[in-house]
């Protein structure tokens, strides 16, 4: 899904398991578990973020056998230094995370995994539009985890985010629901994807959100040197 250079190593990433270590010539060395830190059943997200100030890698994982989501922080030398557990009794589709100043933001949409349906060969994803989406702001350096709620929506990818005047500002690609219904004739999805900007007030817990533009887009990115910081340009 993605490629990462961090701590003097080159990784190929996917969110279903351990990363693969590669050579500079892109030959596969094998699975990498950070010298035993990752256990069987662990994984790393395919879209981790690197703090431009400290060089730390911020990533995450979900396990089927644990009722929580784990945020992992790995220092610039590639050594795991902190794990933060976030209660999450239902397994949701969480594909990305975003660094916002001293916080890490996770979208927890009402798009849930149903392992029993998956084992029977049925559609394993449940969409519950009557359930609010939850936005989770996790302090990287300790402190209370903050929870926010908005009407249901779905998102695969962030663009960037930052902290300003007691608020977290997050730019991301918004969708109305999980996008697994396709038009069989054209191959195009039936719903649009637009850039949105969400603002979380850390004091009042108020959430505001607005569409940035009407352009259909995906795979939003920004200059990684400004990850988690105020920025001017994004690409999608």
What are these regions (language model features)?
Residues 1-236:
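Beta-propeller domains
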């Amino acid at each position: 899904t993605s490629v990462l250079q961090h701590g003097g190593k080159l990784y190929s990433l996917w969110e279903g398991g351990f990363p693969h270590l590669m050579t500079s010539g892109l030959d596969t060395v094998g699975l990498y578990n950070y010298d035993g830190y990752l256990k069987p059943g662990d994984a790393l997200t395919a879209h981790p973020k690197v703090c431009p100030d400290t060089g730390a890698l911020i990533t995450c994982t979900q396990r089927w056998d644990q009722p929580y989501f784990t945020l992992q922080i790995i220092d610039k030398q590639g050594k795991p230094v902190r794990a933060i557990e976030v209660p999450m009794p239902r397994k949701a589709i969480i594909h990305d995370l975003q660094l916002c100043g001293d916080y890490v933001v996770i979208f927890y949409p009402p798009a849930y995994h149903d392992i029993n349906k998956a084992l029977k060969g049925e559609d394993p994803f449940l969409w519950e539009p009557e359930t609010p989406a939850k936005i989770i702001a996790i302090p990287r350096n300790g402190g209370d985890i903050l929870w926010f709620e908005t009407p249901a929506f779905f998102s695969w990818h962030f663009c960037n985010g930052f902290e300003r005047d007691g608020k977290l500002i997050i730019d991301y690609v918004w969708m109305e629901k999980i996008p697994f219904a396709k038009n069989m004739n054209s191959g195009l999805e039936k719903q649009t994807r637009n850039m949105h900007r969400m603002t979380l007030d850390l004091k009042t817990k108020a959430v505001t959100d607005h569409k940035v533009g009407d352009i259909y887009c995906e795979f939003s990115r920004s200059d990684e040197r400004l990850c988690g910081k105020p920025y001017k340009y994004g690409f999608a």
